[in-house]
Structures are given as C-alpha cells and as structure tokens.
Amino acid sequence: MKEITIYGKKLPMRMTMGAMLRFKRMTGKDVEEIGHDVALLVTFMYCCVASACNADNVEFGMDLDKFADGMSVEDMNGFAETLTAAPDEKKSRTEA
C-alpha cells in the first residue's frame, strides 16, 4: 500500500524511519508492540502518512482524530496486511 485516499485526497503512505520515530514519540511504544491493537495500528498509519507527506513535500495538515475519521476499515486491513507481508517479501528478495 503506497498511498491512501482520505477525504478524497490521495496521500503517500510508506514506512520510514521518521514514521517509526513519530510513533515512538506519540505512543511511547515500538512498532513491534502494535499486535492487534487497533488504536496503535491507526496511530502508526497516521505516522506513516505524516512522514511520507513530509518527505515528499505534500501538505498533510490533519490531526490523528481527523485522519482516523476519514479512514475506512478496508484501509486499515490493507495496511495491516502489508505489515505482516513485509518480512516475507524481504526474505524472498534475499533468497533470490
């Protein structure tokens, strides 16, 4: 999932070091601690979008609640799938 549409606006979304740093600062937790906690997952998604927008010079300007209100369950599920698929993708790339 490389972008997300919130309130009709396509925004970049990717995991970056900045996203992990934002998440740690906002929650006091590491990304590995997300587990099945929906609030932590939404917060990490927010951090990924905020960080990608910052890196790409795209205006973001939403707080966490506004962002969450504009998300769908499908957005969250798609992002959760990319989180669980990421280690397998890395493994297959290094094995090839």
Regions found by a protein language model. Give the residues of each.
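Charged interaction scaffolds used for protein-protein
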Residues: 1-10, 18-43, 51-96
